[in-house]
Amino acid sequence: RSCLVGSEMCIRDRYKDDREKIGLNIAKREKRKLIKPFDDLHVIYGQGTAALEVVNEIDTKFDMSIVCCSGGGLAAGTGIVLKNIVHNCQLYTAEPKNWNDHEKSFIQEDIVSIQDKKYGICDALENPKPGEITFKINLALETKGLSADDKYIIEAMKILYDEFDLIVEPSGAIGLACILQNREICQNKKIFTILSGGNIDANRYNELLGIEDG
């Protein structure tokens, strides 16, 4: 659809190519400004508006926030909003177990990179380390990290499909997956989370959920 309106699509190999370097090269070649997907204050503020819309519509003081996390922009933007409204709201990032760089970084209070890159079902969250700007914000907000195994991610996708008629990709269901895997800290809590994205091939979705064609 993007190509139909004149856009040029750049295909990359997720296992070999560096998407940031590709973007920088295109921006340099075409004399354009590169807008980073998370490590940019304007982007972070924009991502925070999702939380702002929720708190403006729902008269609820959340105890916890568990937000899907790749580079940390959505978590940072959400955290800024929630902490300014509910000061004692505990913030968490949600990541797949093999890509829990934020969880590890918060423990160390310094940026930790994933070295053993085991690619899984949450391709949108497979960023090896937190952003410089986002990490400073999240650390200042006293954010902590949670992570989930694939079985909980798939369980979350099934719940969203069966109970809410929602088709959500693995990366988008990671917040609910972390709730399911960390029930002991989530009991009797009012929790803010975001279900983000349905970008998954139909055959792959059915395969993960065990849905037979036809």
Question: Would you name each region that the model predicts?
Answer:
Residues 5-7, 30, 87, 141:
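Short, structured coil segments at secondary-structure junctions
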